[in-house]
Structure formats: C-alpha cells, structure tokens
Amino acid sequence: MAVQESAAQLSMTLKVQEYPTLKVPYETLNKRFRAAQKNIDRETSHVTMVVAELEKTLSSCPAVDSVVSLLDGVVEKLSVLKRKAVESIQAEDESAKLCKRRIEHLKEHSSDQPAAASMWKRKRMDRMMVEHLLRCGYYNTAVKLARQSGIEDLVNIEMFLTAKEVEESLERRETATCLAWCHDNKSRLRKMKSCLEFSLRIQEFIELVRQNKRLDAVRHARKHFSQAEGSQLDEVRQVMGMLAFPPDTHISPYKDLLDPARWRMLIQQFRYDNYRLHQLGNSSVFTLTLQAGLSAIKTPQCYKEDGSSKSPDCPVCSRSLNKLAQPLPMAHCANSRLVCKISGDVMNENNPPMMLPNGYVYGYNSLLSIRQDDKVVCPRTKEVFHFSQAEKVYIM
C-alpha cells in the first residue's frame, strides 16, 4: 500500500512539473497539423480548378497546343501539391517524434536501477535550469548547458529563441516581427481574446504621430481601427486625440501614450500571450519547485532575530535562501516534532524531552552524553545544573 501511495505521489509530481515538457511539443504538432491541412486543401482546390478547366476545354474539340498547355498546368499544380504534402508530413513527423522522445524520457523515472534513476533526476534538474535560464534571457548559457547535458530534444529552446527574436525587434521599436508572429498564431490568439495585435497597431499609430506624419496616421487608423468596439473603441478615441497636440506635449494622457516605456509594456504583453499560447505559467518550474521546497521546511525558528535557533543544515536558515523564502508560507505540520538542539535527534518516547531549570529543553540522551560529575552545562546559557534538576516534559 505504501509503495502504491508513493508511486501515485510521484506520478502526480510528474504531471505538475513535466506539463510543459509535453504540452509545448504537442501544441507545435497541433499547429503544424492544422497548417498542413490548410495547405493541402488549398493546393487540392487549385488542382481541382485546373482539371475542371481541362475537362471543359476537352469537351469542345480544342487544339493540341492548348491541351498540352493545360496538361502542363495540371502537372505543375500536382507537383506543388506533392511538395507541400511532403513538407507538411515531414514537419508533422518531426513533432510527433519529439513528443515520443519526451514521453520515453519521462518513463525512465520509474527505472529500478539506482544509477539510471540518479541520471534521470540529474537530467530533470538540468532541464529545469535550462528553462529558467531561457526565461531570464540567458540564451547562450541555456543552449550550452542543454548541449553539454544532451537534452536539446527535451527542452523548449526553439520556442524561447523565437520569442527572443520578437522581443529584440520590439526593443528596436519595430512591430513587423511581432505582427508576423500574431499572424502565424491568429486563430489561437483569437480564441484567447488576445489584444496584442491591436496594441501593436495602436503603437504604430503613436509612432506616426511622433514623427509628425499625421496624414499617414489617419490612413493607418482607417485601415486597422474601423472594426474596433467596446474598450478598444475607447482607446482608439483617446489616441485619435493625439492628432490635435504636438509630439512633445506635456498634457496627459497623451504624454503617457508617447512615453517610450510603452515598448516595454508590449514586450511584457507578448511574453504573457506567448506563455498562454503554449499553456505555460508565468514562473519557471525551477522557481515553483524551489519555492515549494523552501515552504515545506520553513519554520518560525528560521527567522529568530538573535539567530540562536538557526540550523546550519537548514536551507531556509542560509543567508542566500532566507530572504527568498521570506514571503512564502510556513510549513504545514499536523503533528509537531521536537528536535534536540544538541544532537539534532527527534525527541520521542525513546529520547524524551527534558527541561532544565532555565526553561531550555533538550533530549534525554543528549543530556546523558554531556553529563559530568552528575552535572550538565546548558549549551546556550552556559549555566550549570544538577542532572536531577532536569524535568521530563509532557506534551498534550
């Protein structure tokens, strides 16, 4: 029963931690499947049209040259259809193989061989670090770590490198790359009710006004804002008011609209939509796992001002992690455990807690080990007491 519960807990842990490992390649496979379907349907319709034209021509006793020309057109369309089909199938096959490779890797966690299990855990740690580095913008370091650990097929480097290109273009105050990304994911973004493309068009309008190209700005508004409604219509009305003010105006809200910091907001909006598109959280799995681990062992003793109760073996008590764990909740403990300050052993019926006259509690076995001439010295206050003065503590 205990083994089954442990296996179930491990399975649940994998589902939580490894969700991005399978979800991202699955979404890529799904996207390529839909793109292939559209391409093949489009090319098939082209073939159908030229075949229909050929049949219509043949019904009226045409000249040989015209028939040959139409046949060449049919052959050309069939060649294009074949090429598009082969390319689409190859792309789908690559995505399917990637999904299979990652599934096989996740199955290795249940290996009975200690060495194999240890290697799998090491790879999982490297995968978490690669994803965290990619999220933080350390792309070269992440790629080197993935290559060194042999986990390039197990991490989502391609997705983050694509995002890197988009973010860098926005940092250069260019919208073309991000708009192309929006076009590639148009159907999914529409289902998500994303406003990223609209925000980009608004920014393009603002830049035209900044450059004093007001006539171009009006044309841009007619082209892209004619279908705006609801809150978007209110935003359009606001930016249209910029036409009445100079680019260096200090009047709000037009001054805020002209603030270059809006480009940073667009980067954040793209990043948010990109994570939603691939159903990823805003924090890396490494961050979430670290926070969960710190919270599981965090106690009030880790934050005593005098530092007397801090343990050198406790990660939360360490200087590097103590501040990081500060906003996290304390560990949930249904049953308290008393740990001896001297030995670090749990105090229980085999090592009952004993209280000295000064109020400090230690394990019975520890007091026996430091007793000299029937006297014990309190490690904290250096006070000396007779061993018989220690009283047994009972916890209700």
From Swiss-Prot:
<dbReference type="GO" id="GO:0007010">
    <property type="term" value="P:cytoskeleton organization"/>
</dbReference>
<dbReference type="GO" id="GO:0048821">
    <property type="term" value="P:erythrocyte development"/>
</dbReference>
<dbReference type="InterPro" id="IPR044063">
    <property type="entry name" value="ZF_RING_GID"/>
</dbReference>
<feature type="domain" description="CTLH">
    <location>
        <begin position="159"/>
        <end position="216"/>
    </location>
</feature>
<dbReference type="GO" id="GO:0034657">
    <property type="term" value="C:GID complex"/>
</dbReference>
<dbReference type="GO" id="GO:0005826">
    <property type="term" value="C:actomyosin contractile ring"/>
</dbReference>
<dbReference type="GO" id="GO:0015629">
    <property type="term" value="C:actin cytoskeleton"/>
</dbReference>
<dbReference type="GO" id="GO:0043161">
    <property type="term" value="P:proteasome-mediated ubiquitin-dependent protein catabolic process"/>
</dbReference>
<protein>
    <recommendedName>
        <fullName>E3 ubiquitin-protein transferase MAEA</fullName>
        <ecNumber>2.3.2.27</ecNumber>
    </recommendedName>
</protein>
<dbReference type="GO" id="GO:0048822">
    <property type="term" value="P:enucleate erythrocyte development"/>
</dbReference>
<dbReference type="GO" id="GO:0005856">
    <property type="term" value="C:cytoskeleton"/>
</dbReference>
<keyword id="KW-0472">Membrane</keyword>
<dbReference type="InterPro" id="IPR024964">
    <property type="entry name" value="CTLH/CRA"/>
</dbReference>
<dbReference type="GO" id="GO:0000151">
    <property type="term" value="C:ubiquitin ligase complex"/>
</dbReference>
<feature type="site" description="Essential for ubiquitin ligase activity">
    <location>
        <position position="314"/>
    </location>
</feature>
<dbReference type="InterPro" id="IPR013144">
    <property type="entry name" value="CRA_dom"/>
</dbReference>
<feature type="modified residue" description="Phosphothreonine">
    <location>
        <position position="28"/>
    </location>
</feature>
<keyword id="KW-0479">Metal-binding</keyword>
<keyword id="KW-0862">Zinc</keyword>
<keyword id="KW-0863">Zinc-finger</keyword>
<dbReference type="GO" id="GO:0007155">
    <property type="term" value="P:cell adhesion"/>
</dbReference>
<dbReference type="GO" id="GO:0005634">
    <property type="term" value="C:nucleus"/>
</dbReference>
<keyword id="KW-0131">Cell cycle</keyword>
<feature type="region of interest" description="Extracellular and involved in cell to cell contact">
    <location>
        <begin position="1"/>
        <end position="124"/>
    </location>
</feature>
<keyword id="KW-0539">Nucleus</keyword>
<dbReference type="GO" id="GO:0005819">
    <property type="term" value="C:spindle"/>
</dbReference>
<dbReference type="GO" id="GO:0043249">
    <property type="term" value="P:erythrocyte maturation"/>
</dbReference>
<keyword id="KW-0265">Erythrocyte maturation</keyword>
<keyword id="KW-0206">Cytoskeleton</keyword>
<dbReference type="InterPro" id="IPR006594">
    <property type="entry name" value="LisH"/>
</dbReference>
<dbReference type="GO" id="GO:0003779">
    <property type="term" value="F:actin binding"/>
</dbReference>
<keyword id="KW-0597">Phosphoprotein</keyword>
<feature type="domain" description="LisH">
    <location>
        <begin position="121"/>
        <end position="153"/>
    </location>
</feature>
<dbReference type="GO" id="GO:0061630">
    <property type="term" value="F:ubiquitin protein ligase activity"/>
</dbReference>
<dbReference type="GO" id="GO:0008270">
    <property type="term" value="F:zinc ion binding"/>
</dbReference>
<keyword id="KW-0832">Ubl conjugation</keyword>
<comment type="function">
    <text>Core component of the CTLH E3 ubiquitin-protein ligase complex that selectively accepts ubiquitin from UBE2H and mediates ubiquitination and subsequent proteasomal degradation of the transcription factor HBP1. MAEA and RMND5A are both required for catalytic activity of the CTLH E3 ubiquitin-protein ligase complex. MAEA is required for normal cell proliferation. The CTLH E3 ubiquitin-protein ligase complex is not required for the degradation of enzymes involved in gluconeogenesis, such as FBP1.</text>
</comment>
<dbReference type="InterPro" id="IPR045098">
    <property type="entry name" value="Fyv10_fam"/>
</dbReference>
<comment type="subunit">
    <text>Identified in the CTLH complex that contains GID4, RANBP9 and/or RANBP10, MKLN1, MAEA, RMND5A (or alternatively its paralog RMND5B), GID8, ARMC8, WDR26 and YPEL5. Within this complex, MAEA, RMND5A (or alternatively its paralog RMND5B), GID8, WDR26, and RANBP9 and/or RANBP10 form the catalytic core, while GID4, MKLN1, ARMC8 and YPEL5 have ancillary roles. Interacts with F-actin.</text>
</comment>
<dbReference type="GO" id="GO:0005737">
    <property type="term" value="C:cytoplasm"/>
</dbReference>
<dbReference type="GO" id="GO:0033033">
    <property type="term" value="P:negative regulation of myeloid cell apoptotic process"/>
</dbReference>
<keyword id="KW-1003">Cell membrane</keyword>
